[in-house]
């Protein structure tokens, strides 16, 4: 198949175009469809109403993540609605011969953690899932985006979607990250400067020497939060780091097929003369450990900065900043360091992988969680949990006073028992700090890297992780 020149986004889009619709939209073939228990039940119900089968069940993979409790594996689940949702997913997968990675299978976990670790996510794919953070999979050089329930139905029935093609913005970061600065800080820095709506209508191509130095798990963290900057998808061009990560994984090509796949994947990378709709550049040296202070992921500061005054902000941002200060009970001009913390959460599809847990464990080893602070670690998958336990990371965390949990989405969102209470404030390695996001209508969330969360747990307040390294 001949392939036009241009960006990876252009190439992958062209390869998966079925037709241009009268509306001007593209009918795009979806190579991999990931489903979970929250956004799939209604989609399956709509298929049943129409008497439609799942067209390509082998291109759909299911797991359970959002609603599972992390403190027990017992069935039935204590929450009757959660148990009903899980049973519905199990029944739908059986009825349509869809592979299901269930609790205790060794493959269950957060959908955006398990697909990459199983080798399901590969360069050049189009990937859809009824979940905002599907952009995670772009770390492999895939075009991946979240969809709604009606679109989940469309993919199940036709394996295609009707979509408007996005513009492409190159987000270039150059240089080496300093000690104590992580991928989470990179994406929070980018969103702070480009805005939570800055990427609307765009795909973000993350490029530059910094990304060449990042591991696949670090690239996943960045792409995961592209959506928080308004970009429906974000991606990194595949390279040797990508191929080394995928080689030998359960669903990766084997033998001769592997060699052919790698040759194909190499050709997908954006060409040197590719044209972009916009290009922005950042220097790694300007990025410090970063903490959100408000109610959007774009409201953040470096850990050694003070919170912005309203007058220092663009006029368009002042109203939501004032709203954030009132909700968070913080003051313009105060340092973010020293903000007291009640709960510390390490996990999520953003930062629940083995490298995240290793970074956090380095901080807590030989130290103790501050009395009065509730701290817990939720591995992103059963595979991550097993690997962490094989390395003794669970022992390190438990000795420090952290709770060691089972895999799931946990306190990232309010769909399971892990929730903030009242006005509690959390240091969280998750991706959203919206009002009420972590379960309490008045709960408050500060987003930061897993290592920064670990440092906050020890200090009982926001603190600079660099002092712990």
Swiss-Prot record:
Keywords: 4Fe-4S, Amino-acid biosynthesis, Branched-chain amino acid biosynthesis, Iron, Iron-sulfur, Leucine biosynthesis, Lyase, Metal-binding
Binding-site positions, [4Fe-4S] cluster: 349, 409, 412
Classification via InterPro entries: 3-IsopropMal_deHydase_lsu, Acnase/IPM_dHydase_lsu_aba_1/3, Acoase/IPM_deHydtase_lsu_aba, Aconitase_4Fe-4S_BS, Aconitase_4Fe-4S_dom, IPM_dehydratase_rel_enz, IPMI_cat
One MF annotation (Gene Ontology) recorded for this entry: 4 iron, 4 sulfur cluster binding
Cofactor binding description: Binds 1 [4Fe-4S] cluster per subunit.
Metal-binding keyword on record: yes
Enzyme class, first EC level, given as a word: lyase
Pathway entry: Amino-acid biosynthesis; L-leucine biosynthesis; L-leucine from 3-methyl-2-oxobutanoate: step 2/4
Presence of the UniProt keyword Signal in the record: no
EC identifiers of the protein: 4.2.1.33
Cofactor(s) the protein needs: [4Fe-4S] cluster
Subunit architecture: Heterodimer of LeuC and LeuD.
Family: Belongs to the aconitase/IPM isomerase family. LeuC type 1 subfamily.
Protein name (record): 3-isopropylmalate dehydratase large subunit
Species name: Thermosynechococcus vestitus (strain NIES-2133 / IAM M-273 / BP-1)
Origin organism lineage: Bacteria, Bacillati, Cyanobacteriota, Cyanophyceae, Acaryochloridales
Gene: leuC
